Amino acid sequence: MQDLVLRPKLTSDRRERWQTADGQTRIAPLPSDVLPGSHFGPDLICFILHQYHHQHVTQPLLLEQLHQWGIAISAGQLSRILTENKEPFHQEKEALLSAGLEVSTYVQVDDTGARHQGQNGYCTPIGNDLFASFESTDSKSRLNFLEILRRPHTDYAINEVALAYWQRQNLATGVQERLSQGPAEFADRSAWEAHLQALGITAERHVRIASEGALLGRLIAHGVRADLVILSDGAAQFEVLVHASCWIHAERPLARMVPSSDAHRTAIEGVRQRIWELYRNLKAYRQNPQASQTPLLEARFDALCAERTALPSVNGVLQEMAAHRADLLRVLERPELPLHNNLSEGHLRDDVKKRKISGSTRSASGRRARDSFASLKQTCRRLGVNFWAYLQDRVRGLGQIPALATLIRQRGEALRVEPAGAAPPVTPAVVR
């Protein structure tokens, strides 16, 4: 018979106090399972963290539950347990993204609204089968996304990568010439913006493109792969490095169409059927890539996108797919890539569920704690680490579970096998 014992446990420690011959005072140490400066034991703290971050229990309900069990705790104490003195967790979370980028050939990304202090904000999850990292920011843009990828660094660099980016973005030649002269490295945003001001570069477009290039240049200099694939739903801010698009998002406009006649329904369903037939063929190619199949699949894609129906809306979807041809067929070059972005959708779903239950964040510490524990929880899930055991290990300071960044690197090295039949790395392309 299995059972669960839930009851409060009150412990009072009496510590011996001695005075030495030279007048110094010696106090007996606390037991190893007592957390310094805390009125609450490690099991209770782990339970609170697990209920709030893993089970999505709100603070009022969690407080009521603890009171019903006889735990003497106030709303303020509960809030402090959830948000304060979490620096070890924050540091471990900050190491996840750099470790993941170090061993990954691709990442999946998405974003969603995440209000903070009554103002609009956004949460961007980045991850793959090895890790997940959530970052909440006040804006969503390509500049913001590059800043997230560059973390924990804060510097900018003008190098060949930056120069190539500016050329692809058609940045004015005069602006490029001014930027290529003088310092090439800048410690932080303040130093970079001061440099732009000194050069007289103040137009919004020029500042934005120049900053994106300098961020991208520093990102590659810090060791991020130039051929790293960013798999997204097609949002423009994610079109950096090598971009791949999600097939489910590409087909979704057709799934949402409401036909006005049987003929329209037949036309829509026919196109959808051919899209999913091609999807299944690409999925089979991914499992067993053969170079001889590549031109055949490309020809089928081109024929599909060249179809025209009596519905302009359907034709528009096909034209949009044709415009994203390289992104949708990226799997032909990189068979390790997923064809959809469901993993990021799942990350967002969990974050949205938490936000709908508990509301938006009100303090900087609360926002940071939500990002950190969401990242740690999802990464534990990816790595097969029991989140309850992880919390126990970290709160008690046992050190039995290695740092998650270490586990990511170990798992990444174990999985690092060149994909069969893969084409040589493609040249990074930030815009179409």
Residue ranges with predicted function:
Residues 1-18:
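Short, conserved DNA-binding cores of transcription-related domains
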